[in-house]
């Protein structure tokens, strides 16, 4: 009897609903997936609702292999005969079949519609919402204002990865939310990382790490900054790391167009964070919008400064001119101003990087997945 009571009270079935629709997997999915796996290891059940893709992400397969129930929504329609005679479980409501005790809804971008929130509320299932990124580039239409407000107001918790993102969402729906919490995303480097400092006798090299996507990451801005005569004369090289997400061709052509092959170099994706920082003196990130960019957190953990825009969580993590450099906007002029300030202090970058490492360890969780798992348990008990 005591065992049965323990199971009923402490072992919970968590539902994870991802709004990811533009690609089979992305950085916005890492926190909920790792949290789901940790909850599995603690004996909890996990049910996942994810968009169907021809290719199943290995991380999803890993959860399923360890007992998670995986619903792949919106699959291609079956042949006519199968549609007539099959009892497709997709026609049934995921919530009614799985009966989760609590649900986490994850949005990669703030405009994502989440009618699943209404379905949770109607069934009395407590739910939380995690927004991984918000921007001023897209505003929710006024005709849908009350719908969005309802989704967020009825949530037990709304989790943001930065205060800046929370403000952007609240401005979008013209509502001050009282049920919010700032959380951290997991990083992909040791918390005690300390890669060796690269030599600088022949000049300085900085890394621009992020998918090659001008709209979000702003690589095009750096091309315009570096084409100025003063930067052409300086011993500074920018190396681009990241997968192509639509703008690699333009990036390479812009570099060629302006004759910047010596100053701007495309490296491609690297899965070794410490290796990047063994070869680079600083991070450059001219993002137009972000949530809480992991590359900033990982660079600081590796004792490197970041030169970045005042977007997402960046200003919360570093002190401008002391443990990093923050551009007040995303224009060429403002990025140039921040990079110029950094360049004038280039011989202090190593010392400033050590301070950056100290600041990030003081201001950011050393185990975001553990912390988030505990936060989700409170949704069920609240």
Each predicted region: which residue ranges?
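A short, active-site helix/loop in glycosyltransferases that binds the activated sugar's phosphate group
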Residues: 154-179, 187-189
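A conserved mid-protein helix/loop that constitutes part of the nucleotide-sugar donor-binding site
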Residues: 26-37, 204, 213-228, 333
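Nucleotide-activated donor-binding/catalytic signature segment of Leloir-type glycosyltransferases, i.e.
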Residues: 251-268
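A short, histidine- and acid-enriched strand-loop-helix "catalytic/donor-clamping" loop
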Residues: 76-79, 111, 125-142, 157
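Aromatic "clamp/platform" in nucleotide-sugar-dependent glycosyltransferases that forms part
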Residues: 269, 288
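Conserved acidic donor-binding segment of nucleotide-sugar-dependent glycosyltransferases
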Residues: 320-321, 325-332, 341-346
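A short, well-ordered alpha-helix in the C-terminal region of glycosyltransferases
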Residues: 341, 348-362, 374
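Short hydrophobic beta-strand element within catalytic cores of glycosyltransferases
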Residues: 305-308, 318
């Amino acid at each position: 009897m005591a065992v049965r009571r323990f199971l009923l009270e402490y072992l919970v079935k968590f539902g994870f609903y991802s709004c990811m629709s533009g690609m089979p997997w992305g950085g916005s999915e890492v926190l909920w997936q790792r949290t789901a796996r940790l909850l599995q290891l603690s004996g909890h059940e996990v049910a996942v609702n994810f968009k169907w893709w021809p290719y199943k992400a290995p991380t999803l397969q890993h959860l399923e292999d360890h007992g998670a129930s995986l619903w792949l929504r919106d699959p291609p329609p079956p042949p006519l005969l199968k549609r007539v005679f099959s009892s497709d479980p997709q026609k049934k409501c995921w919530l009614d079949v799985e009966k989760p005790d609590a649900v986490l809804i994850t949005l990669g971008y703030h405009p994502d519609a989440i009618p699943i929130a209404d379905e949770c509320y109607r069934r009395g299932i407590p739910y939380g919402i995690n927004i991984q990124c918000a921007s001023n580039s897209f505003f929710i239409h006024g005709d849908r204002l009350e719908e969005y407000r309802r989704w967020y107001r009825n949530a037990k918790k709304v989790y943001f990865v930065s205060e800046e993102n929370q403000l952007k969402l609240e401005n979008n729906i013209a509502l001050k939310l009282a049920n919010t919490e700032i959380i951290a995303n997991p990083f992909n480097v040791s918390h005690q990382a300390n890669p060796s400092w690269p030599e600088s006798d022949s000049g300085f090299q900085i890394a621009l790490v992020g998918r090659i996507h001008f709209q979000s990451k702003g690589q095009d801005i750096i091309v315009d900054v570096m084409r100025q005569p003063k930067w052409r004369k300086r011993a500074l090289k920018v190396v681009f790391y990241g997968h192509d997400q639509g703008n690699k061709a333009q990036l390479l052509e812009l570099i060629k167009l302006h004759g910047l092959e010596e100053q701007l170099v495309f490296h491609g994706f690297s899965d070794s964070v410490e290796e990047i920082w063994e070869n680079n003196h600083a991070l450059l990130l001219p993002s137009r919008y972000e949530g809480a960019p992991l590359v900033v957190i990982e660079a600081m953990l590796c004792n490197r400064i970041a030169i970045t825009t005042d977007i997402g969580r960046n200003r919360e993590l570093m002190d401008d001119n002391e443990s990093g450099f923050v551009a007040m906007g995303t224009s060429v002029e403002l990025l140039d101003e921040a990079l110029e300030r950094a360049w004038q202090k280039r011989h202090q970058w190593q010392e400033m990087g050590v301070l950056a490492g100290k600041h990030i360890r003081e201001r950011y969780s050393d185990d975001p997945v553990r912390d988030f798992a505990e936060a989700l348990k409170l949704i069920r008990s609240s």
